Amino acid sequence: MLDVRRMRVLREVARRGSFSAAADALAYTQSAVSQQIAALEREAGTRLVERNARGVRLTDAGRALVEHAEAILARLADAEAELEAIAGLRGGRLRLAAFPSAGATIMPEAIARFRGRHPAVELTLEPAEPEPSIAKLRAGEADVVLDITTGFRPPQDDVVERMHLLDDPMYVALPVGHALAHKRNLKLEELADESWILGTAGSCPDVSIFLRSCQLAGFEPNVTFNSDDYFAIQGFVAAGMGASLIPDLALISVRDDIVIRSLGKRPPVRVLWAATLKDSYCSPARQAMLEVLAEVAAEFAENRRALALAS
């Protein structure tokens, strides 16, 4: 294996035309340059430099190696510059994934804020439900993903680390003309006889949260239709097909022919996390994005509290 540092010495000898001039340029002694060239010749298995009355002359092998050395040293310089840029958030790439309701609320502000601070970092965002997002993270195809769980503690996981962002309470959606639409706060027990429109069981954590809440309220819901599109669910509710439970993150836009009602002080809640790989290198870009996500989520939760107090 050829030593890169010795190749740098050879390049200076070729540029300067003598060992002494190369030594001055590199801040070496002349004997150190001579030793480095001799060691490189042993590694190469051939003569690279010939001395003459005017200084030194490269052999054919020496000229060939200098050409490669120029390319190698240039690539190393590029690599060092790129690494410095990444460390200083002046370059690099960050791959994100988020489910639709977070992708329409938390992520736009987080990405805009991140780009305002670190415009040279390339960001990509892939829409994906929590389970596929975590799969991408495990496969090394994403750096930061947003995940939803049904419990306030993160799942036990040897590979994925989760940082809490916010608790996302769920609200009841009813048609405007519903008998309970006039009430600002409802108890889930009051809705025991309703028909329900829910997400697809198994693919949507909201369903398991709702079913568990119904069990605690003492009834089994009558689920008459399934959809994983929250805006479509609003349409089905408006059409009188039933009630639904919609998380706060999905209420960025609400139809005027439905009403959204609170389920009291302890509503069903899902929990939003920023997920990354455990024990993997945390790049400056990844750390910066986690900090931005925490900021945006805290502001979202604070604004939600302010609206609740004002209503």
Regions found by a protein language model. Give the residues of each.
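Short helix-boundary/capping micro-motifs
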Residues: E12-T29
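A short LG(V/I)-centered, amphipathic sequence patch enriched
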Residues: F19, E41-R63
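Central regulatory/effector-binding core of bacterial HTH transcription factors
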Residues: G91-P154, S227
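Hydrophobic hinge/microswitch elements
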Residues: E129-A142, I148, G202-V259
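Secondary-structure junction motif
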Residues: I148, E194-A217, C282-E291, A297-L307
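Beta-alpha-beta core module
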Residues: P155-H164, D168, F231-Y281
